[in-house]
A protein has these predicted regions:
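Structural helix-adjacent loops and short alpha-helical linkers that scaffold large soluble proteins
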Residues: 71-74, 164-166
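Structural detector for internal amphipathic alpha-helices that build alpha-solenoid repeat scaffolds
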Residues: 114-132, 148-164, 175, 183-184
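Acidic active-site catalytic centers that drive phospho-/nucleotidyl reactions
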Residues: 55, 59, 144, 179-181
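Amphipathic alpha-helical scaffolding segments comprising HEAT/armadillo-like alpha-solenoid repeats
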Residues: 131-143, 163-177
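Extracellular/periplasmic ectodomains of large secreted or surface enzymes and adhesion receptors
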Residues: 45, 77-78, 82-90, 95-141
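C-terminal, low-complexity/hydrophilic appendages and adjacent surface loops
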Residues: 1-68, 74, 106
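A short structural micro-motif
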Residues: 73, 85-86, 159-160
Length: 184
């Protein structure tokens, strides 16, 4: 089971030093200009679904996503819930922006300030799979005083816009262009 909380980003992480090398520039050119003959080569350049499920015994290279296959729906649901439970039990801090980590120990800060981690986790899980039914949650998030909430609200809007589920940009979202946090 693979979960992507920002599914509209390309599949591969870009190491900009490595990607600046002549061989990687040639690879970019080959794939992006449509000259490759292997569709798997293009996978790292494309966005991907929020969730993917693979049978590692039958498909060790993880090429055949089973997340949309009805006979795997129950397994997908169990994996989704197991991950959701895990991030809550462990108090996962991986959804915080880099600017949230300066000048203090984040672990101590969220406990001392009684940070609403469960609200953050719910928003994060919703943002990557957002639908128009999520708009009220996203609207509330982008006006939240907590920068992480605003960031993940923006992620939800970006997902909806990319999929053409929304056709206009709310004023509160436009206002975030002037946000003091550069990650938003």
């Amino acid at each position: 089971y693979i979960r992507s909380y920002i599914p509209y980003r390309q599949f591969a992480l870009r190491n900009y030093y490595q990607w600046g090398m002549p061989s990687n520039k040639a690879w970019d050119k080959l794939v992006l200009e449509g000259h490759n003959t292997n569709p798997n080569w293009k996978l790292t350049f494309e966005a991907h679904p929020a969730e993917m499920l693979f049978d590692l015994e039958k498909d060790p290279d993880e090429l055949h996503d089973l997340s949309g296959t009805p006979e795997y729906a129950e397994i997908l649901s169990k994996m989704r819930q197991a991950l959701s439970d895990h991030i809550r039990v462990t108090g996962d801090l991986g959804f915080f922006l880099p600017t949230s980590r300066t000048g203090h120990i984040l672990y101590d800060k969220v406990r001392k300030e009684k940070y609403p981690l469960n609200e953050l986790y719910t928003l994060v899980e919703t943002a990557g799979t957002a639908t128009t039914a999520s708009l009220s949650m996203l609207e509330e998030a982008i006006t939240n005083p907590l920068s992480e909430m605003r960031f993940w609200g923006v992620v939800g809007y970006a997902k909806l816009a990319r999929e053409k589920q929304i056709s206009s940009c709310p004023q509160a979202l436009l206002a975030l262009l002037q946000d003091s946090n550069p990650y938003i």
